[in-house]
Curated annotation (Swiss-Prot):
PANTHER family: MOLYBDENUM COFACTOR BIOSYNTHESIS PROTEIN 1, MOLYBDOPTERIN COFACTOR SYNTHESIS PROTEIN A. It catalyses: (8S)-3',8-cyclo-7,8-dihydroguanosine 5'-triphosphate = cyclic pyranopterin phosphate + diphosphate. GO terms for biological process: Mo-molybdopterin cofactor biosynthetic process. Homohexamer; trimer of dimers. The active site is at 129. HAMAP family: MoaC_B (MF_01224_B). It is an enzyme of class 4 (lyase). The gene is moaC. It comes from the Bacteria. The lineage of its organism: Bacteria, Pseudomonadati, Pseudomonadota, Gammaproteobacteria, Alteromonadales. This is Cyclic pyranopterin monophosphate synthase. Keywords: Lyase, Molybdenum cofactor biosynthesis.
Length: 158
């Protein structure tokens, strides 16, 4: 790997990358996360019997909100005008987990990878928050970028 860190300047200090001269292109990123839990906890979510309400709806909205607030959370991220944010949650009872997938899109000068990752991880954290009274040992895992399109570095897919 010969690439340099783009967020470190010649003096070794962190800085926000200057995207002034970059071209506006269509950009898209997808990310995923999993949250593992006891079968009883997952059943409570799936049946809608959780005392805090609809866990999936709340996690979906939290993920969307988080994508829009990424630059407030991660210091060197640019504020972006996202044109689409999607968060999908799928119960996987055979694995005692929820699979979370996110999609972020825009036409702009910088990518949306961090927004997609923030959406997926925040949705997982929201599920944890809503279910922690029932189960404290849930595990959030495999938060990762699964696909990226647009920009100079081109297409990436796991």
């Amino acid at each position: 790997m010969t690439h340099a860190f783009t967020h470190i300047n010649a003096d070794g200090n962190a800085h926000m990358v200057d995207v002034t001269d970059k071209s506006v292109t269509e950009r898209e990123a997808r990310a995923e996360a999993y949250i593992e839990m006891a079968s009883e906890t997952l059943e409570m979510i799936m049946s809608g019997s959780h005392h805090k309400g609809d866990v999936f709806a709340t996690a979906r909205i939290a993920g969307i909100q988080a994508a829009k607030k990424t630059s407030d959370l991660i210091p060197l991220c640019h504020p972006l005008m996202l044109t689409k944010v999607e968060v999908e949650l799928e119960a996987q009872p055979e694995h005692n987990r929820v699979w979370i997938r996110s999609l972020c899109k825009l036409s702009g000068k910088t990518g949306v990878e961090m927004e997609a990752l923030t959406a997926a991880s925040t949705a997982a954290l929201t599920i944890y928050d809503m279910c922690k009274a029932v189960q404290k040992d849930m595990v959030i895992s495999q938060v990762r970028l699964t696909e990226k399109r647009g920009g100079k570095s081109g297409h990436f897919k796991v």
